[in-house]
Amino acid sequence: MHIAWLGKKSPFCGNVTYGREVTNSLLDRGYEVSFLHFAQEEADSDTWFGCQEVSLPFLYKSQIYTIPTLTASKVLTRSLKQLRPDIVHASLTLSPLDFLLPEICEELNLPLVATFHPPFDGKRRNLKSGTQLFTYQLYAPFLAHYDRVIVFSQLQRNFLVKLGVPLEKLAVIPNGVDVQKYSPGASNLKSQWNARHLFVYQGRISTEKNVEALLKAWKQSNLGDSCKLVIVGNGPLSASLMPFYGEEYGIIWLGFVADEQRRIEILRAADVFILPSLLEGLSLSLLEAMACGVACVATDAGADGEVLEDGAGVILNTHRVASQLHTLLPVFRDHLEWRTLLGQKARARVLERYTLSRNITQLEKLYAEVLRLQRVHLSTRA
């Protein structure tokens, strides 16, 4: 089977990781994959091996959205005609091209699958979640024209059904982690940072990630010199937060860490992983930390609460996150046995529900079903 994958290679975000892990796994299972992405010609050519690549022209791209050039749809159509894939899988990049894809693929008689990533909070508890609701409302009528739309949780599926996307169009296939790579193991980073207790945040430094609530709680808790908070990632709020939350409070800013093995070492050294988001989809960073056997704390935004339910971690309400963390941080510092138990439960939850291997097997079944329905559809038109 030949899969034309439309996704992202830069700038780094969860969508980039998702595309890399899934396409590499499909290649490992013997599929042919062509990778179409927004890039300048010859750019980013060293990240994916074994894929034929097609660069689509763009005016602007960020971690959140992409603005293609006016010729991008023509380049995409021409490329799909030349590649002649069996199926197109779009890991949606929040681009105007997303709305044209169903029409393009219908014209070429190509079945079309999408993965819909945008974070959400189905309870609409804050301004950010109201803004994100608009994205879902905007996309829902167009998602109905895709052959299948992959979402990461039952909660997200139910949310889209309420917005009018037919239930039969939606498939729940959660994010998955390579549990051989992301696993408990030795790390000497604690000694390097002179930390007895290590707390970690990994993700974008942006409003929806609510990192300032964590920083405020950390500063107010005054946990002592033996505790360190490591912030992995960058984003629009980094420059405004770093001057007020620095090393004098035991906070270590690492910025974006490109080396995956280094990120794994950080997670293996961590005692607690904290994700204070106001909005989420299903956080890969959270799953990676859980797979490494780290005790995890996250809000119930998006599907993260579903991941940690029934004792696999500590779930926060998106209201008053700083206050909740102010109470929890000293408890985590003082109770090793609880941290250890939560870490074991987190790893077990990932092994049960969120392995990359399981994810790819579900995806294979979805592709087979979509292709079967496509053949039936074409035969009835003949």
Predicted feature locations:
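Conserved donor-binding/catalytic core segment of Leloir-type glycosyltransferases
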Residues: 4, 192-219, 230
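Nucleotide-sugar donor phosphate/pyrophosphate-binding loop at the beta->alpha transition
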Residues: 111, 121-145
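Carbohydrate-associated surface elements
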Residues: 155, 176
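Nucleotide-activated donor-binding/catalytic signature segment of Leloir-type glycosyltransferases, i.e.
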Residues: 239-258
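Short alpha-helical donor nucleotide-sugar binding micro-motif in glycosyltransferases
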Residues: 256, 265-270
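Aromatic "clamp/platform" in nucleotide-sugar-dependent glycosyltransferases that forms part
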Residues: 278
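Short hydrophobic beta-strand element within catalytic cores of glycosyltransferases
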Residues: 295-298
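Conserved acidic donor-binding segment of nucleotide-sugar-dependent glycosyltransferases
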Residues: 310, 314-322, 331-336
